[in-house]
Amino acid sequence: MASDLESSLTSIDWLPQLTLRATIEKLGSASQAGPPGGARKCSPGSPTDPNATLSKDEAAVHQDGKPRYSYATLITYAINSSPAKKMTLSEIYRWICDNFPYYKNAGIGWKNSIRHNLSLNKCFRKVPRPRDDPGKGSYWTIDTCPDISRKRRHPPDDDLSQDSPEQEASKSPRGGVPGSGEASLSHEGTPQMSLQSPSSVANYSQGPGSVDGGAVAAGAPGQESTEGAPPLYNTNHDFKFSYSEINFQDLSWSFRNLYKSMLERSSSSQHGFSSLLGDMPPSNNYYVYQQQQQQQPPPQPQPPPQQPQPQQQQAPTQGPSNVGGAPPLHTPSPDGCTTPGGKQAGAEGYGPPTGMAMHPPPLQHGGYHPHQHHPHSHPAQQPPQPQAQSQASINSTGFAFPPDWCSNIDSLKESFKMVNRLNWSSIEQSQFSELMESLRQAEQRNWTLDQHHIANLCDSLNHFLTQTGHMPQQGGSHRPPAPSRITDSCALTSGKPEPSMNQVNSYGHPQASHLYPGPAPMYPISTQDSAGYNRPAHHMVPRPPVPPPGANEEITDDFDWDLIT
């Protein structure tokens, strides 16, 4: 017994029987010895018999439920049931619904599957309808000897590479390589890749820190081609592109190196300014203070007390919110608002002027409409003594800024550090809305600002530091008077005091950089190409272009300004 078992385990007599020819002969003899209908007993999804038909017994079994046959088998049964061995698509639908009632109420998804099987299965072939045969639609028949090389309606991906170079070039967006990773082969069979870099990559590829395009394309860093550009396509189909020949680790390293160099190149121009913004708190903390000034009572009462307390509470509802309604930085207001003294009306900057710091909210909203200027002009005539006292108290804390705080990078860094040491929880949020908008736009741009926005941000900080007393206030910058035409936002009488005219720009757009008090900004701003936009009551009205500050001739204005109010 044991000897027989050992001999059976070590016997290799069965090895010659496992040849391919013996297996085919065994399968052929089994199919001939089996019953004729044995092919119909196969499981769903298996290859169907081209000559299979549906018997009445099998049709009766599946009258109540879903049949177990695949869609290809159902199509085969339907076509073989016709005398001509061909059917149209509508006839196939009708035959399936008549023999299998399940599909009558099964929706239309199975019809899509029937169409896909007819189109993609190579066992089915479309036969054009003869001219003498009236009707609609082509016939479908069963191809007993399907051609494996016959292309279907939707060829696989490997057949797409058989197209001519002209067709592939026409499909690409620029007539060249469709993507940066498209491959081309030389006649020697060495895989090479031609990288068509976009314009952004071409701009940043200059400089010592950039990665060579050939190194990225070839998959290995440091390798570049000294010959001419290789042909984009090769018509020799014997050399197929193989992804196994590419070292993806080196390729991904090259792309990461290229991306890093592009970031360094793009941020080099803004490095001097954006680097000092890394230690700043988030933009929602950049609020100005007002409670410290309001807590200090004025030493003397106002001469005409025409500003009641209820109006202070209702004043914020007259215009947009201070933060949300702030105008953008890139649209400075026109320079046509001048006073009889020759000083710019909006020279005090984004918020209310220094003399109005005790009551900024009503004066801000009071200056929003032209007809509201007159009742709010007299309360603004208070002396600046409380402001001077508050500035002195703040300067005593050691937070005073140098006069040249924005002249170089080092002083600007120190200024930001001093601002970070402020108690931001005790600062009012409503006075310096333009500084909030400047910082919000800078954060949206990821602090990659151009020269114009950097200057605007410096001017906003300059005005904020001047108003809060952290930087000594210098004398106002006088300018020659603009043309005598005064816009509706500055339509005040010449007898009104200067602080009441400064309140007009509390909701206006920021003025040019050279109009603010204090030291000159880091970058000058040209005011000739700045189209002005003012905010009247609840809608935007475009302003006519404003002449340069030094223009001596007067421009006639035919616009009916009374229609705005």
Curated annotation (Swiss-Prot):
CDD domains reported for this sequence: FH_FOXJ2 (cd20051)
GO CC annotations on file: fibrillar center; nucleoplasm
Low complexity: bias regions: 207-222
Ranges for region Disordered: 29-61, 125-233, 290-399, 543-565
PROSITE patterns associated with the record: FORK_HEAD_2, FORK_HEAD_3
Biased segments, Acidic residues type: 554-565
Major place of residence: nucleus
Pfam families from the UniProt entry: Forkhead
GO molecular function: DNA-binding transcription activator activity, RNA polymerase II-specific; identical protein binding; RNA polymerase II cis-regulatory region sequence-specific DNA binding
Tissue: Spermtaocytes (at protein level). Expressed in adult brain, heart skeletal muscle, lung, kidney and gonads. Liver, small intestine, and spleen also show expression but at lower levels. In the testis, expressed from pachytene spermatocytes to round spermatids, but not in spermatogonia. In addition to the germ lineage, also expressed in Sertoli cells of the testis. In the ovary, only granulosa cells of the follicles show expression. In the brain, expressed in the piriform cortex, hippocampus, habenula and in the granula cell layer in the cerebellum.
Subcellular location per the Swiss-Prot or TrEMBL entry: Nucleus
Organism domain of life: Eukaryota
Biased composition (Basic residues): 368-377
Listed Pro residues bias regions: 296-308
Function: Transcriptional activator. Able to bind to two different type of DNA binding sites. Plays an important role in spermatogenesis, especially in spermatocyte meiosis.
Protein name, as recorded: Forkhead box protein J2
Lineage: Eukaryota, Metazoa, Chordata, Craniata, Vertebrata
